[in-house]
Amino acid sequence: MNTSSPTRSPQSSPSPNPQSTLSHRPSPRQPQSSDTPPNSSANAPIPDDEHGADLPMNMTASVMLTNLPRDAHQALADVESIDSGKVTVRFQPLPSAPILKNRVFKVSASQKFETVVKFLRKKLDCKDTDSVFCYVNSVFAPGLDEGMGGLWRCFKTDDQLIVAYSMTPAFG
């Protein structure tokens, strides 16, 4: 006999009686005998709460604020002011890329990186079939839907966003 395993007494073991076991299937209905009253506690429905049930509310029915707290209002104002100005972009050619006469341009911070790529393609007189590969700080190629304000805030060098460009893939 293993002493580490608990011994089971008949009272603690599950009952083999199918009427008392729990199952995910409902037990078949048995005809009601004539000696049990129709409103016995076994057949009675579950009563509703006396205080009434709370109905679930969606977000549109939740509490509406008439004005924002002071710190939230200031945070929103700060975010709006970030993308309202212009950012400086410096184009840096990689080897074998054509060189621009003017390398520094200003672009609205609310513009997407796609706008910068289109502008660069126009300045380089690229055909529709030509490829232009752009890299921020010669490290990564941002997505075309990235905001210029966010890129400038995170990756600026001397208050300029350095965009290296090449006609062939330069990095990985």
From Swiss-Prot:
This is Ubiquitin-like protein ATG12. Pfam families: APG12. GO terms for biological process: autophagosome assembly; autophagosome maturation; autophagy of mitochondrion; glycophagy; piecemeal microautophagy of the nucleus; protein transport. Belongs to the ATG12 family. One of its GO terms (cellular component) is phagophore assembly site membrane. Forms a conjugate with atg5. InterPro entries: Atg12, Ubiquitin-like_domsf. It is a peripheral membrane protein. CDD domains: Ubl_ATG12 (cd01612). The keyword Transport applies. Residues 1-55 are annotated as: Disordered. There is a cross-link at G172 (Glycyl lysine isopeptide (Gly-Lys) (interchain with K-153 in atg5)). It is found in: Preautophagosomal structure membrane. Gene3D superfamilies: Phosphatidylinositol 3-kinase Catalytic Subunit, Chain A, domain 1.
